[in-house]
């Protein structure tokens, strides 16, 4: 049996290409990572926590003035936690279509889990950032209401983390 020899570069995944928003941000001097497009073709850009308000402000000035969703996800045990903002340009530059972009901030789970809040820029981030804090433990500095939204104030842990250990005992409060 003969196997075809493969070159070492043949097995490497192709690096994501810069999309139009990435190219525009680069031309404006904003540092970011090209994460490629998601399954719907939406451009994903990685930004450092301190650069998030600057990049979001630049995108808002370009017409991405609607925060469709903010959330978080856990990439798995030992992997980073991610806070993301999905921005939409309604009407697009041609007046008819829409454009979308997702900003992602990766945070080492054993490091500083703080991201500047985008509440001053997008008021709709209020409850969404609180929910992400509540379920993943990502803090949003500068948020005007930094408290739990879904879980009781004395709840220990963050239920949507993949390393979360569910408590064995629940004390139910009597409604009467």
Curated annotation (Swiss-Prot):
Gene3D superfamilies: NADH:ubiquinone oxidoreductase, 30kDa subunit (3.30.460.80). Keywords: Membrane, NAD, NADP, Plastoquinone, Quinone, Thylakoid, Translocase, Transport. It catalyses: a plastoquinone + NADH + (n+1) H(+)(in) = a plastoquinol + NAD(+) + n H(+)(out); a plastoquinone + NADPH + (n+1) H(+)(in) = a plastoquinol + NADP(+) + n H(+)(out). It is an enzyme of class 7 (translocase). GO terms for cellular component: plasma membrane-derived thylakoid membrane. GO terms for molecular function: NADH dehydrogenase (ubiquinone) activity; quinone binding. Its EC number is 7.1.1.-. Residues 1-10 have a biased composition (Polar residues). The keyword Cytoplasm does not apply. Transmembrane segments: none annotated. Residues 1-22 are annotated as: Disordered. It is a peripheral membrane protein. It comes from the Bacteria. GO terms for biological process: photosynthesis, light reaction. Pfam families: Complex1_30kDa. InterPro entries: NADH_DH_suC, NADH_quin_OxRdtase_su_C/D-like, NADH_UbQ_OxRdtase_30kDa_su, NADH_UbQ_OxRdtase_CS. It is found in: Cellular thylakoid membrane. Belongs to the complex I 30 kDa subunit family. NDH-1 can be composed of about 15 different subunits; different subcomplexes with different compositions have been identified which probably have different functions. NDH-1 shuttles electrons from an unknown electron donor, via FMN and iron-sulfur (Fe-S) centers, to quinones in the respiratory and/or the photosynthetic chain. The immediate electron acceptor for the enzyme in this species is believed to be plastoquinone. Couples the redox reaction to proton translocation, and thus conserves the redox energy in a proton gradient. Cyanobacterial NDH-1 also plays a role in inorganic carbon-concentration. This is NAD(P)H-quinone oxidoreductase subunit J.
């Amino acid at each position: 049996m003969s196997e075809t020899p493969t070159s070492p570069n043949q097995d490497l995944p192709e690096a994501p290409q810069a999309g139009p928003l990435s190219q525009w941000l680069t031309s404006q001097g904003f540092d970011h990572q090209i994460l490629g497009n998601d399954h719907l073709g939406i451009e994903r850009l990685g930004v450092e926590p301190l650069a998030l308000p600057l990049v979001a402000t630049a995108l808002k000035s370009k017409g991405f003035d609607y925060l469709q969703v903010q959330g978080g996800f856990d990439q798995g045990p030992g992997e980073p936690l991610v806070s993301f903002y999905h921005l939409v340009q309604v009407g697009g530059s041609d007046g008819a279509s829409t454009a979308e972009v997702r900003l992602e901030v990766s945070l080492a789970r054993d490091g500083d889990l703080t991201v500047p809040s985008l509440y001053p820029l997008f008021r709709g981030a209020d409850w969404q950032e609180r929910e992400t804090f509540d379920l993943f433990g990502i803090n949003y500095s500068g948020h005007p209401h930094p408290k739990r939204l879904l879980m009781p104030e004395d709840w220990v842990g963050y239920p949507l983390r993949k390393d979360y250990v569910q408590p064995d005992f629940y004390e139910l409060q009597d409604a009467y």
